[in-house]
Amino acid sequence: MLLRDVKPADLDAYVRMRCDPVMMSELGGPQPRERIAGQLRRDLETVREDSAWIKMVVAGDSAQVAGTVTLYPHEGISEIGWMVLPEFQGRGLAGEAVRQVLDLARADGRWGLIHAFPSTTNAASNAICRSAGFSLIGQEETTFAGRIFQTSHWVFDSSAHA
């Protein structure tokens, strides 16, 4: 598994991840396809500015994108999120990618407390939080892409895990 920064050629992967009803079922449903190119442009700019990390998860020795892990400032906190395409799920890629990003965050030193908000019904993502060393704070309503849903609120102190 390899992590790399998002690049312009990732538009198809963005569409596959964000417009698919199965992929987005735990995030309030699919996003409109016409918004995805703009999202990619904004993400590329954030990576250029180094204000967020948007890492594409590449499976094995192939160049095929399997998913993404993002770490970004959001409403005064550092937030991490991830998704893996259905055909790559169940291989441990998301867990490995999240742990690698947390290792990078520890070394970088600027992220402090890192929050994750998986849907309360997303057993796999909640298990990743647990196994990666996050502490469960509680449950709350979260808005993502204009949709409200119930999430588990996890926190990881990247400075305490140095």
Predicted feature residues:
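Positions that flank functional sites
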Residues: 121, 144
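Conserved acetyl-CoA-binding loop-helix of GNAT-fold acetyltransferases
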Residues: 84, 90-105, 123-131
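Conserved hydrophobic beta-strand within the GNAT/NAT acetyltransferase core sheet
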Residues: 114-118
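Conserved acetyl-CoA-binding loop of GNAT-fold acetyltransferases
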Residues: 71, 130-140
